[in-house]
Amino acid sequence: MLFDKVKAFSVQLDGATAGVEPVFSGGQAVAGRVLLELSSAARVGALRLRARGRAHVHWTESRSAGSSTAYTQSYSERVEVVSHRATLLAPDTGETTTLPPGRHEFLFSFQLPPTLVTSFEGKHGSVRYCIKATLHRPWVPARRARKVFTVIEPVDINTPALLAPQAGAREKVARSWYCNRGLVSLSAKIDRKGYTPGEVIPVFAEIDNGSTRPVLPRAAVVQTQTFMARGARKQKRAVVASLAGEPVGPGQRALWQGRALRIPPVGPSILHCRVLHVDYALKVCVDIPGTSKLLLELPLVIGTIPLHPFGSRSSSVGSHASFLLDWRLGALPERPEAPPEYSEVVADTEEAALGQSPFPLPQDPDMSLEGPFFAYIQEFRYRPPPLYSEEDPNPLLGDMRPRCMTC
């Protein structure tokens, strides 16, 4: 049968070494070949190639239309970011051409648009890039081969906006049974807004406990995924790194003189996609017994081009290339402890009162992994994404007012 004459049919990309696929950025050329191996001569109608890049989001929400009527509302949106078509083999005359047995290679190349979105895989959306080859033959079904490729858009943290220090202050009145127990204040700052994976954030903070009970300061890097469709939004939050300080006694003050918080290997910020965003923030909070947490949030941008001392563009390009190499091949240390759930950092439940650790490990194995940050990367060896929380239990309260930095 003609179907059995095709021994191999695949798409291969140039630049792959030792089984590691290349990583692309906007404006680069994607080149490769379609491999067709025949056991005997075969007639072929056409060989066509299509490259696509698409950002897609989808989620459902339960709605109520009365006391006894419920329905499910679906939200979906997609954006095409790459679209390329090419015919690699077409018969000169007639409807088919005959290929001899053996190995046949059909080269292809196309240019990516100058601006793209980083490959991403989330619970309610994704950004995926792929190349599909289709072999048309008479009287048999078409044969298809698919190749997924990864795009990482450069995010240079060596810009004035991302090099600017970030600081803030908050205070809250501690209450218990409607009694005023004193004022707790928090101020924090970091040296810049932009960081890259593997860097350490030195956290400077001052915690002034004017209440009558001990308080516990903590800090965490939180990732927020925002999905947008038809005017609606869906958010998922995850703690990717955290630290806990020592309790601050009544009437005492504590200073953090650059407490180290290391950024794990996470995906970069995605800020310019119409249907999804990936944002990061440093959240410093103080657990106050009997009162909702005092929370201060400082924005972060996770980039791909690390901080360099001289600001040369050649250095930026080299640093970005180094990031891509580390991202694909870098040997990481042994897998660390999984970070805590987002709700454990910001929820109002006082875990300390139950005698539990402020950062318990997740117990449900089915919830410990929701898929890689990037699509279809077999060699991606970063830690699995942390657990997610559907809602933000810490809306800003009216009694939170700014306070001058003192540290």
UniProtKB/Swiss-Prot annotation:
One of its GO terms (cellular component) is plasma membrane. It holds the Pfam family Arrestin_N. One of its GO terms (biological process) is protein transport. InterPro entries: Arrestin-like_C, Arrestin-like_N, Arrestin_C-like, Arrestin_domain-protein, Ig_E-set. It comes from the Eukaryota. Interacts with WWP1 (via WW domains). Belongs to the arrestin family. This is Arrestin domain-containing protein 2. It comes from Homo sapiens (Human). The gene is ARRDC2.
